[in-house]
Structures are given as C-alpha cells and as structure tokens.
Amino acid sequence: MATSASSHLNKGIKQMYMSLPQGEKVQAMYIWVDGTGEGLRCKTRTLDCEPKCVEELPEWNFDGSSTFQSEGSNSDMYLHPVAMFRDPFRKDPNKLVLCEVFKYNRKPAETNLRHICKRIMDMVSNQHPWFGMEQEYTLMGTDGHPFGWPSNGFPGPQGPYYCGVGADKAYGRDIVEAHYRACLYAGVKITGTNAEVMPAQWEFQIGPCEGIRMGDHLWIARFILHRVCEDFGVIATFDPKPIPGNWNGAGCHTNFSTKAMREENGLKCIEEAIDKLSKRHQYHIRAYDPKGGLDNARRLTGFHETSNINDFSAGVANRGASIRIPRTVGQEKKGYFEDRRPSANCDPYAVTEAIVRTCLLNETGDEPFQYKN
C-alpha cells in the first residue's frame, strides 16, 4: 500500500520549529467547502491577538477560479467566518475557522448550502431540532487501495471486522484514535467511534447538535480527519461505495428529534414525521448526496444493510429500511428516528435542511419551497 511522500519526512525536525514561541500572535486556519460540494480547502492568516468569539474574526478572500467556484476573469470570493474551534494541530491559542463562501456580488456560492440551511433552522428554532450524524469512511492508500488489504487480493469476508479487535480485524486504529482525540481537543461534539463492517472502514458519531451546529461540527470533524490522515500518509474517502461487490458501502445515518418527540408520547410525533417523509422520498434522495442521488444509487441497493433507493420503508430496529425507529424508542414511546438514506459524502446542511422542511415546515412536492425574506 502506497503512502504519501510527506508522511516520510522527519517529524522531529518539524516539532523543533513548532515548539518555538509565537508571542501574542495567533494562527487562524480558514476552512471552506469548495465547488465540488465535497472537498475542503484551507489557508492560514496571522491575527494580532486571540479572538474570543467568531464575530471578532475578519472576513477574508481567495481565488475561486482555483477551487471550482468562479472564472479567472472574476475570481475573488469572500470567506465569512461562522464557527470557531481550537486548533489540535498547532494547539492553543491557534484556531480553526469554518467559513461560508460568498461570490463577488455578495450572494452565497452555489455550494454554500449553510446559508439557506441557517435560515430554515431559525424558522423552527422553537421546536429545538436535534441531529446526530454517523459518519462512515474508508481508509485508503495514495494508490487507491484499501488500507491493510492484500496488495493483489482481498481480505476474508465480512463478519469479524465490525467493532473488531486485533491486528487481523482492525485496520488503522491509530488514525481513528488520533482523530478522536483531536476532535475532543478542538471542541467538536464527537460522541463515539467504531470499526465498521468492511475492513478499513470506520465510523464516528457527531451530536446531538441543535440546528445549524450539526453541519458545522461535522464539516470540521471531516477536516480534522483529512488532516490526521495527511500526517499518516493515507487517505480517508467518503465515497458511498468505494469497493464494488459484496462489501458494505458507507453512509451518514442521520438521527433526528424535536422537543415534542423527546417528551412523553413523542412516538406519535415521530410517526407523523415518518409519514411525511414517505410522501417525499425522491426529494430526499436528491438532497442526500452531492450528485443528486447518483452516488447513493451505487449504495442503496437493498443489500448490505441498506434500503432500495427507489422505495421508501420504515420499521423498528430494521437496518434494511429507509427509516429506522430504535427498539428503545418503540418501547419508551419517545425519542428519535434514524434516516439511513444519506450517503457518506452528503452535505450535512442539505440533509438536515431537507428533514426540517418536510417534517417541521410540512413541505410537499419534489422541490423546496422558496420563502420570502
């Protein structure tokens, strides 16, 4: 398995410089979603002092023609800080800064899905929507070969790898542990991790987060994962079906509840929400991966713990359904439900917005409603 050239550099030499004092200055790494709707970009600027809140961070700009977001003849785009985290790579007082992207005319960039999502979340803030997202990913070498797999073959069939322990079952745990601790340091609301069904496939969970914070925390968790993998010389892919054949795909199962669902007899509200979702299946399929459903078509086959992309289904403890109601929720008659359709490479802003539009704003039809300002 191939690893990157950078991972073979002497990290001790780098540490000699990273241990130098930086005075009162602060390094702020600005992070944004590029024009693919999946990739992340970043660049760093120096601040004179440590910012206490995101509002103290200055707006910045970048060359959108190099990120698939504009043409070269009019390439300046704006970075507007919206969320701030501690930097686990440079450590305190340095910061990671998540940004929204705006075009030259101050309109949101096409892949700035946070802007409208924030507006939708504000409309239902009195219902306190909570989300938890289960991010699956696969570790790969720089040659595109799964981490730890035989160079000219396949590992043993699925079965012993899910939550597995041992060198022959868990591939790349060092990366998982490093990512977990880095997220905790940064202030990302990471709540767990586990090895998944396919060897070299892992999952981490983010949440519960209310409203727009779900997307903010998941995007930063993804960024941290990419940076950790960069240090180890490997790649984390969110491809929903990285290996064709009899291997599990990768999803981003999304758990959702409102205050009413979490209270006594909330199961009635959960069932009402699921009924609304059943009547808008194709709208959600289009929102649940960056290619309008084409990526998920490779994953949602009705096999390997997935539903069929063309059919809506729901059930208690059923991992082959579109919507799963956890058994404990069915017993306690309150709690949350799990939408198992989102792909691993989904935009969390698109997913959470779609759920709120259908379940709380009672939208119907195949297109989102355009609300007046």
From Swiss-Prot:
Binding-site residues, Mn(2+) 2: 136, 196, 203
Positions of region (Required for glutamine-induced ubiquitination by CRL4(CRBN) and proteasomal degradation): 2-25
Induction: During erythroid cell maturation.
Enzyme Commission code: 6.3.1.2, 2.3.1.225
Post-translational note: Acetylated by EP300/p300; acetylation is stimulated by increased glutamine levels and promotes ubiquitin-mediated proteasomal degradation.
Residues that hold Mn(2+) 1 according to the record: 134, 253, 338
Family matches, as InterPro entries: Gln_synt_N, Gln_synt_N_sf, Gln_synth/guanido_kin_cat_dom, Gln_synth_cat_dom, Gln_synth_gly_rich_site, Gln_synth_N_conserv_site, Glutamine_Synthetase
Oligomeric form and interacting partners: Decamer; composed of two pentamers. Interacts with PALMD. Interacts with RHOJ. Interacts with BEST2; this interaction tethers a fraction of GLUL to the membrane, causing a decrease of cytosolic glutamine synthase (GS) activity and inhibits the chloride channel activity of BEST2 by affecting the gating at the aperture in the absence of intracellular glutamate.
Residue positions binding L-glutamate: 246-247, 319, 340
Subcellular location, principal: cytoplasm
Domain of life: Eukaryota
Residue intervals of the GS beta-grasp domain: 24-106
Taxonomic classification: Eukaryota, Metazoa, Chordata, Craniata, Vertebrata
Compartments (UniProt record): Cytoplasm, Cytosol; Microsome; Mitochondrion; Cell membrane
GO biological process: angiogenesis; cell population proliferation; cellular response to starvation; glutamine biosynthetic process; intracellular ammonium homeostasis; positive regulation of erythrocyte differentiation; protein palmitoylation; regulation of endothelial cell migration
Chain positions with N6-acetyllysine modification: 11, 14
Residues annotated as binding ADP: 336-338
SUPFAM superfamilies: Glutamine synthetase, N-terminal domain, Glutamine synthetase/guanido kinase
Assigned keywords, A-Z: Acetylation, Angiogenesis, ATP-binding, Cell membrane, Cytoplasm, Endoplasmic reticulum, Ligase, Lipoprotein, Magnesium, Manganese, Membrane, Metal-binding, Microsome, Mitochondrion, Nucleotide-binding, Palmitate, Phosphoprotein, Transferase, Ubl conjugation
Regulation: Glutamine synthetase activity is inhibited by methionine sulfoximine (MSO).
Protein name (Swiss-Prot/TrEMBL): Glutamine synthetase
Residues at which ATP binds: 134, 203-208, 255-257, 319, 324
UniProt keyword Nucleus present: no
Protein source organism: Mus musculus
Phosphoserine PTM sites in chain numbering: 343
Residue numbers carrying Phosphotyrosine: 104
Protein's job: Glutamine synthetase that catalyzes the ATP-dependent conversion of glutamate and ammonia to glutamine. Its role depends on tissue localization: in the brain, it regulates the levels of toxic ammonia and converts neurotoxic glutamate to harmless glutamine, whereas in the liver, it is one of the enzymes responsible for the removal of ammonia.
